[in-house]
């Protein structure tokens, strides 16, 4: 990233209403507890509608029937989405059995949705079941604290079961970072777990009384895998190992993908390298990055409030120097690291500890019993007999981790009988979508419901051009908020309107380049016609080992995005 003339450290002006709401919320309590008892509406009123996000929930409604209900003079069919806090995606089989039961008995859709932030979501929780879901999670050692809104969200960690020792160390750091950056308010425990109100004043030494200016995302990544897509995140700790043992981290700050259609003040941005730090400084540095963003982030405009915009406004070196000052360290030069891929290794992998790990491809992360493919029942049966744990990946897949040789056949039999090991193409394995319709209030176009048939069509094109054994990192996101991480794909579709998408090209396989818009507001047939021609050219003209995204740049089909703050919209 180029350094532009540094701007003000703090943006002066009228604060957004979100800042008022946080300040007046009494450390995130609001009147949520009272609202729970209001049976006249299925939703939360006033500030509580937004405050519940700090407690891991979003209020949604079924958009498929919204117009019909409006005609009948009924309020929207409100239900909550709840997202669990699950650093590194590791969940025990006991916990899995509990969430399976809750999903089946207490949600409208009956499904467990794995997300690309290595956790699970319940969709369709009615208001009467909101308190019970928090209590169920607590009973098995889980919570939903700080998985949404202006806090440090669920901390990701590379799913690398092969190098078990390194993964174990990195995972422990992901947990420590998550715990260190949690809010200290007792609101969550008081409202959901019926813990007594204590006559002490709440304090938030790290997050402050008005919390962060905007959402904040953190990862721990183990090269050469970039499965967690570090450049989509505000703060990234890249594991540096010596002789298979973790010794420190490279720190990269200021990634983020969310944009707004037509708003050139918004842009996706890759993270900037700050330097290397030994392990013992990890928590101090994490806190320093968060508090610098807390104090310098833009609280007058939520569309320009994320860390990426703060870095561009004040300058990377200024931000880095402030982090060093607050943490009491000097960063060492970045240690060498490289990425070779982002996908999960589907199927069995033997770890260096001689245990086996089975990665199951879960299309769109949606776990449900489908006709002839009882995925949810199959995973429940595995959870009942498996002595290791489950791991949710950032590609929305699931790893049955730590399977001894003696248990392998038994687990494989259940997985095969449940449709969990059905053969899929390399292209399908490397494609992903966010949830979008019918539950997401921000959705502009279909994503999860669109992807399976769209990939059928892409598979046909790959076969037509003789490249069925290859893949293109392809992602669909229903709106420019970017949950599907399309702005780090080789081919990214960003929803514009029902049935219409912006087509972005020119990202790369390893997720280190932002793609540029190639065509705007086009339909699926138009997308397929463009990709038919381009895949054909790639098949014929590519160099050895050249990915589709790199080819589109080299062939002059699309100009690479070099400095997105300045050239993304050119």
Swiss-Prot record:
Gene3D superfamilies registered for this protein in UniProt: Sulfite Reductase Hemoprotein, domain 1
Segments traversing the membrane: none
GO (cellular component) term, any one: sulfite reductase complex (NADPH)
Cofactor(s) listed in the protein's UniProt record: siroheme; [4Fe-4S] cluster
Keyword field contains NADP: yes
Gene Ontology BP annotations: cysteine biosynthetic process; hydrogen sulfide biosynthetic process; sulfate assimilation
One Pfam family cited in the UniProt record for this chain: NIR_SIR
Pathway named in the protein's UniProt entry: Sulfur metabolism; hydrogen sulfide biosynthesis; hydrogen sulfide from sulfite (NADPH route): step 1/1
MF terms (GO), sorted A to Z: 4 iron, 4 sulfur cluster binding; heme binding; metal ion binding; NADP binding; sulfite reductase (ferredoxin) activity; sulfite reductase (NADPH) activity
Disulphide linkage map: none
Substrates-to-products reaction catalysed: hydrogen sulfide + 3 NADP(+) + 3 H2O = sulfite + 3 NADPH + 4 H(+)
Annotated residues for binding of [4Fe-4S] cluster: 434, 440, 479, 483
Residues engaged in binding siroheme: 483
Alphabetized UniProt keyword annotations: 4Fe-4S, Amino-acid biosynthesis, Cysteine biosynthesis, Heme, Iron, Iron-sulfur, Metal-binding, NADP, Oxidoreductase
Cofactor note: Binds 1 siroheme per subunit. Binds 1 [4Fe-4S] cluster per subunit.
UniProt keyword Cell cycle present: no
EC number in record: 1.8.1.2
Protein's job: Component of the sulfite reductase complex that catalyzes the 6-electron reduction of sulfite to sulfide. This is one of several activities required for the biosynthesis of L-cysteine from sulfate.
Subunit structure: Alpha(8)-beta(8). The alpha component is a flavoprotein, the beta component is a hemoprotein.
Family per similarity comment: Belongs to the nitrite and sulfite reductase 4Fe-4S domain family.
Record protein name field: Sulfite reductase [NADPH] hemoprotein beta-component
Organism of origin: Shigella boydii serotype 4 (strain Sb227)
């Amino acid at each position: 990233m180029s350094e532009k003339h540094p701007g003000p450290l703090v943006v002066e002006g009228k604060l957004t209403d979100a800042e008022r709401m946080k300040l007046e919320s009494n450390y995130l309590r609001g009147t949520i507890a009272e609202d729970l008892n209001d049976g006249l509406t299925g939703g939360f009123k006033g500030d509580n509608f937004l405050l519940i996000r700090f407690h891991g929930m979003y209020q949604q409604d079924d958009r498929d029937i919204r117009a019909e209900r409006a005609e009948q003079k009924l309020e929207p069919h409100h239900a909550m989405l709840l997202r669990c806090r699950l650093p590194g995606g590791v969940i025990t089989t006991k916990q899995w059995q509990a969430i399976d039961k809750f999903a089946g008995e207490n949600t409208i859709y009956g499904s467990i949705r794995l997300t690309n932030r290595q956790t699970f979501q319940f969709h369709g929780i009615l208001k009467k079941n909101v308190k019970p879901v928090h209590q169920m999670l607590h009973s098995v050692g889980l919570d939903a604290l700080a998985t949404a809104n202006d806090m440090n969200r669920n901390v990701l960690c590379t799913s690398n079961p092969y190098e078990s020792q390194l993964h174990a160390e990195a995972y422990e750091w992901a947990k420590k970072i998550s715990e260190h950056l949690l809010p200290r308010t007792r609101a969550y425990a008081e409202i959901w777990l019926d813990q007594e109100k204590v006559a002490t004043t709440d304090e938030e030494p790290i997050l402050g009384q008005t919390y962060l200016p905007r959402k904040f995302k953190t990862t721990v990544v183990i090269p050469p895998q970039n499965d967690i897509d570090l450049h989509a995140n505000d703060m990234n700790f890249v594991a540096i190992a010596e002789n298979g043992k973790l010794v420190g981290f490279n720190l990269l700050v200021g990634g983020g993908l969310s944009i707004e259609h037509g708003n050139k003040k918004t842009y996706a941005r890759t993270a900037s390298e700050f330097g290397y730090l030994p392990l013992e400084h990890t928590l101090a540095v994490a806190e320093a990055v968060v508090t610098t963003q807390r104090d310098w982030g833009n609280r007058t405009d939520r569309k320009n409030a994320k860390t990426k915009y703060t870095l561009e406004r004040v300058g990377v070196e200024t931000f880095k120097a402030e982090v060093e000052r607050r943490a009491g360290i000097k960063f060492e030069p970045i240690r060498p690291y490289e990425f070779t891929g982002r996908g999960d290794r589907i199927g069995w992998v033997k770890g260096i500890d001689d245990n086996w790990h089975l990665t199951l491809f879960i299309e769109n992360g949606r776990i449900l019993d489908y006709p002839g493919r009882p995925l949810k029942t199959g995973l429940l049966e595995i959870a009942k007999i498996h002595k290791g744990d489950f791991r949710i990946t950032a590609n929305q897949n699931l790893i049955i981790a730590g399977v001894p040789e003696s248990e392998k056949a038994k687990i494989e039999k259940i997985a095969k009988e449940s449709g969990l090991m059905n053969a899929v193409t390399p292209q399908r394995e490397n494609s992903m979508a966010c949830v979008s319709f019918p539950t997401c209030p921000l959705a502009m176009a279909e994503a999860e419901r669109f992807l399976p048939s769209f990939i059928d069509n892409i598979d046909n094109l790959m076969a037509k051009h003789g490249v069925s054994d290859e893949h293109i990192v392809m992602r669909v996101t229903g709106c420019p908020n970017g949950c599907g991480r399309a702005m780090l794909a080789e081919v990214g579709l960003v929803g514009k309107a029902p049935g219409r998408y912006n087509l972005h090209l020119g990202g790369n396989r390893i997720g280190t380049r932002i793609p540029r818009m190639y065509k705007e507001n086009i339909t699926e047939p138009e997308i397929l016609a463009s990709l038919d021609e381009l895949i054909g050219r790639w098949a014929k003209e590519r160099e050895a080992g050249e990915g589709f995204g790199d080819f589109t740049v080299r062939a002059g089909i699309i100009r690479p995005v070099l400095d997105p703050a300045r050239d993304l919209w050119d």
